[in-house]
Design a protein with these regions (language model features):
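Helix-to-beta-strand junctions that scaffold the AdoMet/dcAdoMet cofactor pocket
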Residues: 164-165, 178-180
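GHKL-family ATP-binding catalytic core of two-component histidine kinases
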Residues: 146-148, 165, 205
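Conserved N-terminal segment of class I S-adenosyl-L-methionine
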Residues: 2-148, 154-157, 280-285, 292
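S-adenosyl-L-methionine-dependent methyltransferase catalytic module, highlighting the catalytic core
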Residues: 167-169, 173, 183-293
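A short SAM/SAH-binding and catalytic strip from SAM-dependent methyltransferases
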Residues: 153-165
Length: 293
């Protein structure tokens, strides 16, 4: 059993009644709800639609496009700001996932090369969610988390909230599961093309993100540009060109080439992110909030 899985066992709960839950029998002894397992990974999820998505995830054959993607992985399409990098490194020092009494949960983040490098040395970091890439310790619905109340020291959520039909409920769940004094670090797009994974519902301004988390009790520690206006512009151009190509494998190859060709220009955001107007045209924002003691 991995270190992250051991830590998960300490804070796992039934998503229905939120009481302690054993993964061995897959049935909650309190409310008697039973949950399935997919590809050896436990899935305490009540939403039947999500359950069906998980089933198809493991039975469908890979397309040619997906096989090419496995052979030639896509580099990160956006560039993280200096401010967001410093913030992430700082909170990982404050809430070290390797500490025995510290529980750090990653929901969604980790697919990108940037996050793989950041999280590489933390084998006790718990990953949950419905990944379109990579692995998790447990499948989970962000709007009904299978975690004990007041159990998490630090929650990461990168580019997840825009894919949820009920973001208010998801942020409410983050507040429930985080310990008093604990932190949430979230990244949410502002200007970006529609992208399904499997659905895409909303975008937020920098003030909209703060308002969303404030409504559910969080105190803002910091907010800012995660990926700037040049990233937004180049990604829109890239998507406009790529989406005009109907054939999947060729589309992926064009996207790969454009990502590499345009990437150097994204460093211009290290300059433009310093200006106030950068917030008006940014690609992504980040938000750091703390649950009051």
């Amino acid at each position: 059993m991995s270190n992250s899985h051991k830590k998960l066992m300490d804070i796992l709960s039934c998503p229905t009644c939120h009481l302690a839950f054993s993964i061995k029998n897959k049935t909650c002894k309190h409310c008697e709800r039973s949950y399935p397992e997919y590809d050896g990974i436990f899935a305490p999820i009540n939403d039947l639609k999500i359950q069906e998505e998980l089933k198809t995830l493991f039975i469908k054959e890979k397309t040619l496009k997906e096989k090419i993607k496995d052979f030639i992985p896509m580099p990160d399409e956006r560039l993280w700001s200096q401010s967001s990098k410093k913030t992430i490194n700082k909170i990982l020092l404050e809430k070290n996932p390797q500490a025995s009494d510290c529980y750090v949960v990653n929901m969604g983040s980790g697919v990108e090369t940037f996050y793989k490098k950041v999280f590489r040395k933390y084998d006790s970091l718990i990953r949950i969610g419905i990944p379109h890439e990579g692995s998790v310790d447990v499948f989970a619905d962000a709007m009904q988390l299978p975690l004990k109340s007041n159990s998490v020291d630090l929650f990461f959520s990168s580019s997840v909230i825009e894919h949820l039909p009920d973001p208010e409920r998801a942020v409410s769940e983050l507040f429930r599961t985080i310990k008093p004094g604990g932190l949430v670090y979230a990244e949410i797009p502002f200007i970006g093309a529609y992208h399904m994974a499997p659905n895409d519902y909303q975008r937020y301004t920098i003030n909209g993100i703060e308002s969303l988390f404030n409504r559910h009790g969080f105190d803002m520690v910091k907010k800012g540009i995660c990926s700037g206006p040049i990233n937004a512009l180049l990604l829109l151009v890239q998507h406009a060109v790529v989406e005009a190509i109907p054939i999947g494998p060729i589309q992926y190859i064009f996207r790969l080439i454009l990502t590499w060709l345009l990437h150097p220009f994204k460093y211009l955001d290290y300059i433009f992110n310093r200006f106030k107007w950068g917030e008006y045209l940014a690609c992504n924002f980040y938000y750091l909030g703390r649950k009051p003691l």
